[in-house]
């Protein structure tokens, strides 16, 4: 049976992550409060950020920026802004 959490991003009960995917206290906070669905949404945004901003995950500043964006997205409800990206409309 899947573990459920009260997802802070989705604002509802949902299936939780199978295991802690991120290290440290932030990782525990994500594991305890973020659903698999919300994490998948973040992963898509993360990929776009890395690609569009040409982030280097070996660079400490780039990792710090990405972590800030993750916290803003998952816990503070702030949308990730990606310069030049225009979401596809449903009727296209």
Curated annotation (Swiss-Prot):
Pfam family, one: Iron_traffic
Gene Ontology MF annotations: iron ion binding
CC per GO annotation: cytosol
Swiss-Prot/TrEMBL keywords: Iron
Example GO biological process: cellular response to oxidative stress
Keyword Iron in record: yes
Described function: Could be a mediator in iron transactions between iron acquisition and iron-requiring processes, such as synthesis and/or repair of Fe-S clusters in biosynthetic enzymes.
Protein family: Belongs to the Fe(2+)-trafficking protein family.
Protein name: Probable Fe(2+)-trafficking protein
Organism: Shewanella loihica (strain ATCC BAA-1088 / PV-4)
Source organism phylogeny: Bacteria, Pseudomonadati, Pseudomonadota, Gammaproteobacteria, Alteromonadales
């Amino acid at each position: 049976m899947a573990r459920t959490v009260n997802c802070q991003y989705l604002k509802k009960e949902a299936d939780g992550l199978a295991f802690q995917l991120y290290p440290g206290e932030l990782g525990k906070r994500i594991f305890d409060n973020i659903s698999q669905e919300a994490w998948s949404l973040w992963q898509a945004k993360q990929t776009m950020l890395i690609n569009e901003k040409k982030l280097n995950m070996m660079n400490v500043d780039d990792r710090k920026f990405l972590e800030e964006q993750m916290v803003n997205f998952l816990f503070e409800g702030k949308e990730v802004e990606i310069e030049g990206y225009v979401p596809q409309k449903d009727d296209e």
